[in-house]
């Protein structure tokens, strides 16, 4: 409840309005925490069976056709004041083939590469890569907007038509990054993925990537 309260407070403090906020939770009833924000933001609360993918799919199923862009957020994320307005600005200038744009997680160290890690096949010079070894290079704290091969499922804005066309199937993995890669990496082969440098968020979780 504490984490989602922080997230909703950061949405309340954004420098632009959002059209709809859908919270899907499992376990403890947190409707009292959620609905106290209803006076300030267009928030809705739903419950589901446990599982990040189940929660995300239920939220997506509730969307109507008027919603072109959908942000999928983990509950420990906190928006910077201009994160959404910068994201909208970025989307207004990308190619039509763009499927998703990630927020820039700025409180986690960004990509660091050295020749030895590269020799072992566990790193690459560029951020946002998926390597043959299965390792990924970081998409956090980028210093400029980048095109990438994977995106964080809990901090990305997708075109709704992409989410509808490619449902996020449940997988048995205790590692959230694995779920993110399985969903987003194939999209990078057909569409364009970015991380927007100016669209900044912070997260409480420590482990976001394999580096």
Model-flagged regions — what are they?
Residues 67-78:
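Short beta-strand-to-loop acidic/aromatic patch adjacent to the donor-nucleotide binding site
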Residues 57-69:
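Active-site nucleotide-sugar/metal-binding loop of Leloir-type enzymes
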Residues 153, 174-182:
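Acidic donor-binding loop at a coil-to-helix junction in glycosyltransferase catalytic cores
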Residues 189-211:
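Active-site-adjacent helix/loop segment of glycosyltransferases
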Residues 9-18:
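Short, acidic, metal-binding catalytic loop of nucleotide-sugar glycosyltransferases
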Residues 82-122:
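Conserved donor NDP-sugar-binding/catalytic core segment of glycosyltransferases
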Residues 121-148:
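Short, flexible, basic/aromatic active-site loop/helix in glycosyltransferases
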Residues 23-34, 77:
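A conserved acidic beta->alpha catalytic loop
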């Amino acid at each position: 409840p504490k984490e989602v309260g922080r997230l909703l407070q950061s949405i309340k403090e954004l420098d632009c309005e959002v059209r709809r906020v859908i919270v899907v939770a499992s376990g403890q009833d947190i409707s009292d925490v959620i609905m106290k924000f209803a006076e300030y933001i267009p928030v809705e609360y739903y419950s589901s069976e446990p599982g990040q993918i189940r929660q995300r799919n239920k939220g997506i199923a509730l969307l109507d056709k008027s919603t072109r862009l959908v942000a999928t957020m983990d509950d420990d994320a906190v928006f910077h004041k201009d994160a959404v307005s910068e994201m909208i600005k970025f989307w207004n200038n990308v190619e039509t083939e763009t499927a998703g744009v990630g927020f820039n997680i700025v409180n986690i160290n960004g990509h660091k590469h050295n020749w030895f890690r590269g020799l072992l096949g566990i790193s690459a010079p560029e951020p946002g890569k998926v390597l043959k070894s299965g390792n990924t290079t970081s998409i956090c704290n980028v210093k400029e907007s980048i095109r990438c091969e994977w995106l964080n499922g809990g901090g990305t804005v997708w075109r709704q038509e992409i989410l509808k066309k490619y449902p996020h199937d449940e997988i048995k993995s205790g590692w959230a990054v694995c779920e993110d890669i399985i969903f987003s990496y194939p999209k990078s082969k057909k569409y364009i993925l970015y991380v927007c440098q100016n669209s900044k968020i912070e997260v409480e979780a420590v482990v976001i990537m394999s580096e």
